[in-house]
Amino acid sequence: MSEECTHDCSNCSAACSSRDAAPQHDAPNPNSSVKKVIGVVSGKGGVGKSMTSALLACAMARRGYHCGILDADITGPSIPKLFGIHGRAMADDKGCWPIQSRMGIDVMSINLLVENEEDPVVWRGPVIAGAVKQFWTDVVWKDVDFLFVDMPPGTGDVPLTVFQSLPVDGIVVVASPQELVSMIVAKAVNMAEMMKVPMLGIVENMSYIVCPDCGNHINVFGNSHVDEVAAKHHLPVLAKCPIDPKLAELSDAGMIETYGGEFLEGAADACEKLLKK
């Protein structure tokens, strides 16, 4: 190793015995074309990760990009419900085809493959991880600008499989305002660093609720700690999303695409910058 080594192998052309091996990702379906893969993660469940994935895909679709959502939360899939998709994904000699939403967003989820969407998926970790991998290798993601991967919470088999198998270009961490978020976000950030996957920033969900009478912001979960957590990890806060009963109503009705909130524009900007690099 040279004394001048910066330990940044990505920007070095030297033939060095200390060079990190290039990641060996699984090849996508031969008929797929995906420009950027964005992972949406959370350290715990119930923070609105799937809703963030859906709204971010909608925000990018409104900007004219063709988006897809790979629902990697095999045991708790909710993406089809948010978009009002209840059909069965079809397959041919080219592969399995995602179902398109009203806005043209490609969606693939385990709920689009089972006979009854209410049937539980009682699989062990390796089988679940294998299914997620097949959503990349067997599904035809045709001319997709941004593929958002809605991951299950935590740092278990599925996130590890996604980071190892898919060429993830960036990660968005979804968190809530509680102080506990510091430890939870740290776990997600540390895993991303271990897997050498770049972090785009943090989205704080359920940040506040707007009083319908006076318009003031009410911090339902107390004062937010996301700014200090983001500063600690040198990450930007991409958005602070409110609790909005209208969003919950539209999500339950499968009409999330009609929601007009613009609070994820900062996160959309971060994704768009990846495409322009």
Name each region found by the language model.
Residues 1-25, 189-277:
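C-terminal lobe/tail of nucleotide-utilizing enzymes
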Residues 34, 45, 71, 79, ...:
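Residue-level signature of catalytic and energy-coupling elements of molecular machines
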Residues 142-149, 155-156, 167-188:
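Conserved Switch II/interswitch segment of TRAFAC-class P-loop GTPases
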Residues 31, 36-74, 189:
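Walker A/P-loop phosphate-binding motif and the immediately C-terminal alpha-helix
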Residues 49-54, 77-80, 151-159, 180-184:
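Short glycine/serine/threonine-rich phosphate/pyrophosphate-binding segments
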Residues 114-162:
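Phosphate-binding/switch loop-helix module in NTP-utilizing enzymes
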Residues 66-67, 72-117, 122, 129:
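Phosphate-binding loop that captures ATP/GTP phosphates
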Residues 108, 132, 151, 164, ...:
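Glycine-rich phosphate-binding loops of nucleotide-dependent enzymes
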